[in-house]
Amino acid sequence: MSYVKLTDCEELVMKCVWDAGKDLSLVETMALLKDNYGKNWKRQTISTFLLHLIQKGFLTSYRVGRVFYYHQEIDLESFRRQQTEDFL
């Protein structure tokens, strides 16, 4: 996969997904952002970041009942390795 740059906010959302170690819903992501990083972003703002991350290939989503869950497609180690290769 070619390197895709993340914004600081997108990277923060990905950190929540990576730290959780499981698929997250929007509500779970909101709670982690608030509890771990002090970000009290609105639901639509986080939804937009999640959509951008899907478009960039970092996440996929699936639906269970009425809830969408977000699954990481790129792990933290792969992301960091690609950042390092880009830097060098």
Label every PLM stretch briefly.
Residues 1-16, 20, 75-78:
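Short alpha-helical segments that sit at the start of domains
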